[in-house]
Amino acid sequence: GQASTLPLWRVRGQVSYLDEGAVPELPFVLCREAYLTRAAGGIHSAGATYDLHDHDPQLRQSSHDENLSKVRSLLGDAGLVPDAPLRGRVGFRCVGPDRLPLVGALPDATPTGRAERLRDLPRHPGLYGLLGYASRGLIWAPLAAELLAAQLEGEPLPLERTLVEALDPARFMLGKARKHDIVTPGPPVETP
């Protein structure tokens, strides 16, 4: 497809579910090197692992233990009930080489010759993307959506031009195009 040449890959993440009472009641979400949510429906969520080059969709005890270790570091002496049973889910993040999201018109990877600026690179008409949030989707998604809406409607952009360019999906092609190399983006998204 038109996005298959973007330099994106998938990164495994495992979230652990802990029964209410397995950790002290929290008035808020804790977040540092990991996160721990308040109980919702009797369950706390804790996580998540960040497993590069790992396509295993199954829950693993080792990932669960990693999450529990991170929860212990968040809580300090407040405690965690030992031996929480293995429960949770596995998901896969979409990640780019610089870990910034890709927001805007998707580039056409057809060889183009020399290009000095992002706006000089060809795009697929009418094809836009909001992807590659890595583990920061909750932070980036609202701003990225506002940026894309402004681009689509021709409205003033909500960000400075340098940040808009840092998020442009064609940014990975620009260096090659400046050197007059054939424009070919990085490896496609890995699939299991």
Model-inferred region functions:
Residues 77-192:
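C-terminal catalytic lobe of FAD-dependent flavoproteins
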Residues 1-125, 187:
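Active-site substrate-recognition segment that forms the wall
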